[in-house]
């Protein structure tokens, strides 16, 4: 006998409830989209003229003394290139820790590199060292196994994700911590833009091993790196850092004058302002290496005006090896104005170049986690070092020139001859460039 289905007739009350539930869900969806895509820092449109150079005292007062803390003298900053340079140095620092290790990263994978750092942190925690690990909920949350987190926590490591993805706080979902910080015993620090995964290992020997740079810091500047870590640790874990084990008295370790510039949620974006002042002050050279380069209209204007003052403006950006092709398409939309304005663009050929650095007139350097893009300017929480030192600037220029030897110039004619599909992709990606 065939079975007959019973028709369920909803009453008026049930229909009204369902309608209100649907309206409520739609409203929550709109709120979520607004929070994710439209909440960002206020960014000022800069209208700057060339009135002083980076060698003049006015530049130091305008660019470096805008923020708290002010620049500190007496620092030593080493540039460590590629995984063979920075990973052994960072692991050695962790393994030599006596009191405290504070480690913050955007990307940590469960792979050979991630496990090496996991094991080093676990070994120190077992030895009685206070170990704190703070990873971004997006950059690492999908890539680090829960078993690795559990292993660290079981031996006493304090662990937290910054802005976890699976959270009711949708207003935080799009605001990522892009900072990279390692501070050991409050005396030695590392920062830059690297990730802790196998593609950052090696010596950029092939397309599977990226080219990147990390800084090793000694001197009073280390306390600023510690402060930057503590800011996010308090927000995430609810614990302050104090005492001589975290903030020892730091004497001079070198002669470099520098400061750590951090961006915060809903505050003025300090890095774009510093970049803008440096662009306006340049008299000889602006050399920029940037992994994800989608400059704003204001930044393009300042760079083109610098060329008009006979400043040599050059970019090194990723070439055929790029892990974010859509970001590359969004960035290329700005190439036309840059190239027509006399800016030179070079594409790095051997592998993905992940460096985020600039040097102006061999005197002022900016180095760290920030890309030259709207996301770093308006959304992410970044950490960069602003360095006012000619000897360090000379090293930055030497690094740029070395990378330039492995790069090919991208010309205005190439830009004009790009394919129909390249143009379509650029047009489609441009509205989303702040999210890429």
Model-derived features: positions:
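Charged, low-complexity intrinsically disordered terminal segments
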Residues: 2-436
């Amino acid at each position: 006998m065939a079975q007959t289905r019973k028709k369920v007739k909803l009453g008026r009350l049930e229909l009204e409830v369902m309608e209100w539930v649907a309206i409520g869900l739609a409203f929550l969806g709109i709120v979520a989209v607004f929070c994710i895509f439209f909440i960002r820092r206020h960014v000022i449109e800069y209208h700057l003229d060339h009135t002083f150079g980076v060698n003049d005292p006015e530049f130091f007062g305008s660019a470096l003394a805008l923020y708290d803390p002010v620049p500190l003298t007496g620092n030593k900053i080493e540039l460590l290139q590629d995984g063979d340079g920075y990973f052994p140095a960072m692991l050695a620092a962790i393994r030599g820790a006596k009191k405290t290790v504070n480690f913050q990263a955007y990307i940590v994978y469960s792979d050979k590199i991630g496990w090496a750092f996991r094991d080093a942190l676990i070994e120190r925690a077992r030895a009685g060292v206070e170990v704190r690990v703070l990873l971004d909920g997006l950059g690492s949350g999908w890539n680090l196994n829960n078993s690795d987190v559990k292993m660290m926590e079981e031996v006493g490591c304090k662990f937290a994700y910054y802005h976890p993805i699976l959270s009711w706080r949708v207003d935080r979902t799009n605001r990522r911590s892009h900072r990279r910080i390692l501070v050991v015993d409050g005396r030695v620090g590392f920062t830059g833009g690297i990730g802790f995964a196998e593609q950052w290992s090696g010596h950029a020997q092939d397309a599977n091993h990226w080219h990147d740079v990390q800084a090793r810091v000694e001197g009073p500047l280390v306390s600023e790196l510690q402060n930057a870590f503590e800011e996010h640790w308090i927000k995430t874990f609810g614990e302050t850092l104090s005492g001589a084990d975290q903030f020892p008295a730091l004497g001079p370790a070198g002669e470099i004058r520098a400061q750590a510039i951090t961006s915060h949620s809903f505050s003025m974006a300090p890095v774009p302002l510093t970049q803008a002042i440096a662009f306006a002050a340049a008299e000889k050279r602006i050399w920029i290496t940037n992994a994800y380069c989608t400059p704003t209209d204001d930044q393009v204007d300042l760079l083109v005006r610098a060329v008009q003052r006979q400043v040599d403006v050059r970019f090194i950006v990723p070439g055929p090896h790029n892990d974010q092709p859509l970001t590359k398409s969004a960035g290329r939309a700005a190439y036309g104005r840059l190239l027509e304005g006399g800016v030179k663009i070079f594409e790095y050929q051997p592998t993905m170049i992940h460096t985020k650095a600039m040097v102006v007139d061999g005197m002022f350097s900016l180095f760290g986690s920030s890309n030259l893009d709207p996301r770093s300017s308006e959304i992410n929480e970044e950490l960069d070092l602003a360095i006012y030192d000619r000897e360090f600037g000379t090293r930055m220029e030497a690094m740029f020139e070395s990378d330039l030897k492995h790069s090919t110039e991208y010309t205005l004619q190439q830009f004009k001859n790009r394919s129909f599909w390249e143009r379509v992709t650029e047009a489609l990606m441009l509205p989303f460039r702040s999210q890429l």
